Amino acid sequence: MTEPTQTQPAVAADENQIIAERRDKLRALREQGVAYPNDFRPTHHAAELQSTYADSDKAALEANPVEVSVAGRMMLKRVMGKASFATVQDGSGQIQFFVTPNDVGAETYDAFKKWDLGDIVAARGVLFRTNKGELSVQCKELRLLAKALRPLPDKFHGLADQEMRYRQRYVDLIVTPETRDTFRARTKTISSIRRFMENADFMEVETPMLHPIPGGAAAKPFITHHNALDMQMFLRIAPELYLKRLIVGGFERVFEINRNFRNEGVSPRHNPEFTMMEFYAAYTDYRWLMDFTEQLIRQAAIDALGTATIQYQGRELDLAKPFHRLTITQAIQKYAPQYTDGQLSDDAFLRTELKRLGVDVSQPAFLNAGIGALQLALFEETAESQLWEPTYIIDYPVEVSPLARASDTVPGITERFELFMTGREIANGFSELNDPEDQAARFKKQVEQKDAGDEEAMFFDADYIRALEHGMPPTGGCGIGIDRLVMLLTDSPTIRDVLLFPHLRRED
């Protein structure tokens, strides 16, 4: 049999006309009986067949017939006189159907010729290879399972509008193999993290999404109202304080993979709703956390991609090498060597320099900022975006780390790190502050900052203080941004590419 050159259906100028024509076809189907049947069960998937019979030639398949039942979406159709082909796509991949009136009957064949691209179809038949060597299903029975009323995008142009890809992700997934690959990699990444945590004796838990007091991070919360309790509540900005309550309760290793919500801007790195993995381990510190996090991320890459060496936006990123470790001032002087030690400890200089770089130092967060907070702001302006290779920035100042344990040896510094790759923060962790009186004092300072106009400053959580007063063992805790990690592993330039349904403005 010969396979003619593929011809594409003409692109209709009026999509509404296409939809109207398809609705007419659906009405005809309804008149014939059940328009959306649900009694077909596939026995095989496309990728499974392509893999299992990759080495089976035409003669082998003829000598040992393989009966299959396959269903999926019709992506291409080539109708000829007495023999036609259709490319059908299921959740695993694609396979070709070969359809003739002799095999399926003249009535079914005539109906098939009227079916549209995008329709969900099913076939029972036997495998064979065409003269060109393509593995195909010779259909003995052919059925229409679901009529597609809307046409798929043109094959050659696809979903050219990027926002439309986000808004109609269901269509994007149908027509863009790379999108499907991205979300499969995301699932593999999360599965790998879960296995890694369970193998390290961590227990997965679930903590509340609705909080009476927002806490665990410096962020602006979403506010809602609980009608039955008649009280204001907040979508959680972080699970940290609840997870540490569990450490107090005796669960010495816990983790949670779930959503956080922050009522802030949208950018290539930020979405108001995002996925975090936070974990806490008793009798550890931030040094242990850095080693553990490094191993976890390396293993996630291997499990998702098969390698620890990845390509991101045209540059290589080697996760197999030991991650770098720098203090805030070391990072500044590495990537902006014009700054001297004296300048980095000069309050007036730092404020002037930040203003020159475009930072509004008059905002509430800077009014009473100390040297450490000013150094951090300068780091964010001069060094952060240049941290391509995996790098831990360590020793954050107390004033910007209200939940972290202070250093025993260096005044004003905490045992805290943030992990950066490709210029983005991926993780944040520290030895946890378990002194209830110190924690209460820091909460009070946060309240003062909030009263001064800093919307992201923390509230005073009296119940959390009460939990600490029961005694929390020395603990290390870390949060990893799952979305940003998946961005790296899938070479995605924006967080929207790794969220199935990112937040968008309303359609007009």
Swiss-Prot record:
GO biological process per UniProt: lysyl-tRNA aminoacylation
Q: How is the cofactor bound?
A: Binds 3 Mg(2+) ions per subunit.
Pfam families for this protein: tRNA-synt_2 (PF00152), tRNA_anti-codon (PF01336)
InterPro entries recorded: Aa-tRNA-synt_II, aa-tRNA-synth_II, aa-tRNA-synth_II/BPL/LPL, Lys-tRNA-ligase_II, Lys-tRNA-ligase_II_N, Lys-tRNA-synth_II_C, NA-bd_OB-fold, NA-bd_OB_tRNA
For this UniProt record, the keywords arranged alphabetically read as follows:
Aminoacyl-tRNA synthetase, ATP-binding, Cytoplasm, Ligase, Magnesium, Metal-binding, Nucleotide-binding, Protein biosynthesis
Positions bound to Mg(2+) 2: E425
Q: Which cofactor does it need?
A: Mg(2+)
Q: Which reaction does it catalyse?
A: tRNA(Lys) + L-lysine + ATP = L-lysyl-tRNA(Lys) + AMP + diphosphate
A single GO cellular-component term on record: cytosol
Instruction: Give binding positions for Mg(2+) 1.
Output: E418, E425
Q: Does the keyword Magnesium apply?
A: yes
Q: Where does the protein end up? A: Cytoplasm
> Of which family is this protein a member?
Belongs to the class-II aminoacyl-tRNA synthetase family.
Give the multimer and partner information.
Homodimer.
User: What is the designated name of this protein?
Assistant: Lysine--tRNA ligase
Q: Which organism is it from?
A: Burkholderia vietnamiensis (strain G4 / LMG 22486) (Burkholderia cepacia (strain R1808))
Q: Which gene encodes it?
A: lysS
